[in-house]
Amino acid sequence: MASMTMRFHPNSTAVTESVPRRGSVYGFIGYRSSSLFVRTNVIKYRSVKRNLEFRRRSAFSVKCGSGNEAKQKVKDQEVQQEAKTSPSSFAPDTTSIVSSIKYHAEFTPLFSPEKFELPQAFIATAQSVRDALIINWNATYDYYEKLNVKQAYYLSMEFLQGRALLNAIGNLELTGPYAEALSQLSYKLEDVAHQEPDAALGNGGLGRLASCFLDSLATLNYPAWGYGLRYKYGLFKQRITKDGQEEVAEDWLEMGNPWEIVRNDVSYPVRFYGKVVSGSDGKKHWVGGEDIKAVAHDVPIPGYKTRSTINLRLWSTKAASEEFDLNAFNSGRHTEASEALANAEKICYILYPGDESIEGKTLRLKQQYTLCSASLQDIIARFERRSGASVNWEDFPEKVAVQMNDTHPTLCIPELMRILIDIKGLSWKDAWNITQRTVAYTNHTVLPEALEKWSMDLMEKLLPRHVEIIEMIDEELIRTIIAEYGTADSDLLDKKLKEMRILENVELPAEFADILVKTKEATDISSEEVQISKEGGEEEETSKEGGEEEEEKEVGGGREEGDDGKEDEVEKAIAEKDGTVKSSIGDKKKKLPEPVPVPPKLVRMANLCVVGGHAVNGVAEIHSEIVKDDVFNAFYKLWPEKFQNKTNGVTPRRWIRFCNPDLSKIITQWIGTEDWILNTEKLAELRKFADNEDLQTQWREAKRNNKVKVAAFLRERTGYSVSPDSMFDIQVKRIHEYKRQLLNIFGIVYRYKKMKEMNAAERKENFVPRVCIFGGKAFATYVQAKRIVKFITDVGATVNHDPEIGDLLKVIFVPDYNVSVAEMLIPASELSQHISTAGMEASGTSNMKFAMNGCLQIGTLDGANVEIREEVGADNFFLFGAKAREIVGLRKERARGKFVPDPRFEEVKKFVRSGVFGSYNYDELIGSLEGNEGFGRADYFLVGQDFPSYLECQEEVDKAYRDQKKWTRMSILNTAGSSKFSSDRTIHEYAREIWNIEPVKLE
């Protein structure tokens, strides 16, 4: 049965034609674009309809690397011939773009047509660009449908997209025409682009990585989609006041999002609470509870110089209309009447809601399950539709790859099992086989204590059927562990079970408990005499040594990319592991033994990811080794084939080509081609020109032009004036103790103190002028991080108003750091700081962006720093600090009172306490760097340990900067050595080695 479906060319009247309903619910067919250009006769109706009919009948000639010729041949030779004569892409001219913008300015309902000011100009321009995306967006989806290719689905709680306008027209190669069109309308493209708010869908590198990956997937023509949540208020907007950081709700959706298409026809039910019952057929049924609807919002993601345009599908949540209690409302009980609606909508209010309360924890778990459930229902519906009349579930892993970006989407595993078993009727064995072959997991965490865990009681209440499935998976794992290690050594088996089980502090199922009890009894009887002889002091010593041995395994770490507000919990876990929590042992008064608290039952999400997926990858070489040797060592020994490395990358389109056009032109001029944008290996050709004076002159001019722009931006944003002739020294990333902004600002304080001790001539001779720029958000409940923000701003307020110092030193904290601010700062940067405690950063991606833009780096051997230093050359990287393998030993020395602080470090602390930076009490902040034990003390992140080498390294920075020819050469070599860190390379590796997908290119 045919239905009337609307198919559109972006610059034409909507064309109504009778086509099969194929895909109208789950694809893009049916989206109503605006009629724009028929009124101006730019594109003829008949040619538009002919092109649309061609798209409907079959798709396009295709380049496909799968090697399966039978799938890739287009059978209809007539359509093939027509494809040769059809335009391969849409390239509007300036006149048609002007007409398009005018149309949207008049008919877009967000604004009054009486005015055409900058906000209206942005919305109208964005909608015009979106129209240009629709044709490729539909064609890409249609072709995936036709070929039924294997498709990757990237699930992430964050997508930090940044502004979309310049990126979209850049990828479409329409920057020039749009700039000219807006000029004819009396606007500058740059001014219009600045009206766009950053999409508040992420916070840190976790979300930015996901967005870079989408750009690369589209550019490289891989069949893939992203799935996330549509947060109404984002994480928060950061304001800096005299009291430090203040958080307010993001307002990025205040004027709507012109890039998204609301898909009210694509929604899925998501259930919470309820109970599990067994039906007459013996099957489990999850019934009752609270139902909400997840509604799709689609955002087209264009590739660079390709027709491929993939999709980012974001879910919003709402309650069904029948959930509104009309009787209660009419009775005056308005809050009660709309309670269900409010409960549903708040799931997607903010990213990472505070989880100190049970309500906050519940909301976070609801967010994670909503993402997983709605996305999997959508994926499965697409698989079934593409499969046609006969669905073979064994083919599911051959058509679908699901990548979990960190542990937030872990519930994909039990949810896929639930759907396959309870709804599709598969056996446990078949469902488990399919799930393991479909799902893969990216780890971003190097500290075992930071791995996500959920209360089993909470999960059992909220998702009762999923807990049953997780318990069964845990039983499968127990069987595997027993089969691997046997029962002869009960202590070893017990250790492995405690380390590897998905459920923590949960008793073994009866069948396994009996095995262990019998084994333990046999072992105890056979060794009874030996045990008696070893009672007493020896036993205590053995226990002590065992504890130290466990400590030796620790490398330390924090959550790599995302900031989900777990810092306080992680710090407590660290303290407990180190034995630095205050204890009553040694209290001289005898006390009655306190009852031992029952440890909470927990679900270890990372363990579930490892068990339930077919691949586990780290995000930098050193991180992947830590994952194998420490974080998941027991699993690595059991399944070494699962573990891989996929060093992160960033898209060179956004992070050089579009954000740094001056440098891009220079690179193209000297390499002789723009191919480096798609093939970054060509950047290495810059090495042979590194000493060329003409290139160096151009390089410095481009850098200074960017610095002038940043100086104007800083004056507007912060009120501080800076000199573009100073060195721009930048540290921008979320505020966290392990990232050590405190080390940076302590170094600045030391520099300031030394300046104050000199006369003007001495200061000028001994110090290179610097502008020290900070940016990043502290999580709202992370008190120590917020103290660091306050301290930085206090130092800046003092230093920047000191007439004796002038332009020799400025300290600027940029509020509300985001992608757009990064695109401004990174091209202007000359030194960037990546100074985390060694072994605690999984990878990092900002270091890659800085390197691409010719910025020198000072840092530790941590995360991707290790590989960046290898690629750019050790002589072009300022290295300092302890190595990862030394960290545990240094902490032990501190605990034993062997650490002797550097006098310069003590000097800085005393200077801060003198009140020179204001009356704020910094005892808590400085106290965290003092003492040898105690929670929140003992300098866990080794600021004092690395302070001397950091200062000495900064002296080397000053020395190098004075020789501008040498510095410029180093800068060029950083760009030349950054080719490895393109997200294109990373995506190729994922596609080949984890997802098993091939490029599919529309022509």
From Swiss-Prot:
Catalysed conversion reaction: [(1->4)-alpha-D-glucosyl](n) + phosphate = [(1->4)-alpha-D-glucosyl](n-1) + alpha-D-glucose 1-phosphate
Major subcellular location class: plastid
Cofactor: pyridoxal 5'-phosphate
GO cellular component labels: amyloplast; chloroplast
Residue numbers bearing the N6-(pyridoxal phosphate)lysine modification: K849
Top-rank taxon: Eukaryota
Gene3D superfamilies: Glycogen Phosphorylase B
GO biological process: glycogen catabolic process
The EC number(s) this enzyme carries: 2.4.1.1
EC supergroup of this enzyme: transferase
Pfam family, one: Phosphorylase
Bias (Basic and acidic residues) ranges: 569-580
Family, as annotated: Belongs to the glycogen phosphorylase family.
Name of protein: Alpha-1,4 glucan phosphorylase L isozyme, chloroplastic/amyloplastic
Species this protein is from: Vicia faba (Broad bean)
